[in-house]
Amino acid sequence: MSGIAQKLASNQKQVAISEFFEKNKHFLGFDSPVRSLITAVKEAVDNSLDACEEARILPTIKVKVSKLDTKKDIIELVVEDNGPGIPQKSIEKVFGQLLFGSRFHAIRQSRGQQGIGITGVVMYSQLTTGKPTHVRSKIATESTAAVVDIGLDTRKNKATKSNAGREIWQHEDGEMKKHGLEVTTRMKAKYQKGRQSVWQYLRMTSIVNPHAEITFTDPDGEVHHWPRVTERLPGKVESIKPHPHGIELGQLQRMLSESTDSRISVFMRTNFSGVSTRAAKELLSLIHI
């Protein structure tokens, strides 16, 4: 029996988070060809809206869906925005590493928070077509755009990159692109019309984001345009501290172990919202500290 136990123990190994999602892609919203396309569009558009709003830029987003192989349901998705762009050295982490992001530890309202979404799109595209995702990024301080093909090593949760370089990025009218991001990816998915469709998602997105201009080109070449109806950006979202009522006991224990505060009252005031000096004293008196 001990030999069997040792053999079973030797077969156990830690699984990378990206390898887990590769085998359980339905957890990321890629559970059917129709929903997979909507999920990919949502993740890319959410990233564009968040980036533009954080940089205080009125969003202009272009989405294009093309059918490359109708028999195999291979679709190409292109999403372009006028956001601040991503520095070249950060592209591979943003697109090729799960749980990489700037908002995971911050308590604030935002569309993307877990650092999974767009990397999940890269992974699903690679899984279903074997092709990397092409990224083009231009930041305002540079004259040319960075371009790179991004894949994902699921065993290491690390990006693989190829064809990296720089190029001039111009609009269709020949004007230079000042800043922005373009993501081009191919995946096994289906485009459909109606309620559960990319068109419907983008239409609803334009309604709840009146400050955004969204243009969608469908597989038939028809262009759908939702213009910006206000020049006013939403108020800037600030991070807040947690409230004592909203955390679990284990979280409190971890915060206490990591704190450098010498007094519990100081810890309460500096780490939580809604805790004044008076409230901290009342709380400590109730628990006899």
Tell me what each language-model feature is.
Residues 4-5, 76, 89-90, 101-246:
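GHKL-type ATPase core
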Residues 70-78:
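Short, highly conserved beta-strand within the GHKL-type HATPase_c fold
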Residues 60-70:
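Short beta-strand/loop element within the Bergerat-fold HATPase_c
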Residues 287-289:
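Conserved small/polar residues in nucleotide/adenosyl-binding loops
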Residues 20-42:
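Conserved short strand/loop->alpha-helix "switch" segment adjacent to the catalytic nucleotide/phosphoryl-transfer site
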Residues 34-61, 119-122:
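Conserved ATP-binding N-box helix of the HATPase_c
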Residues 81:
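Acidic ATP/Mg2+-coordinating residue in the GHKL
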Residues 85-87:
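A short glycine-centered beta->alpha linker in the GHKL/HATPase_c
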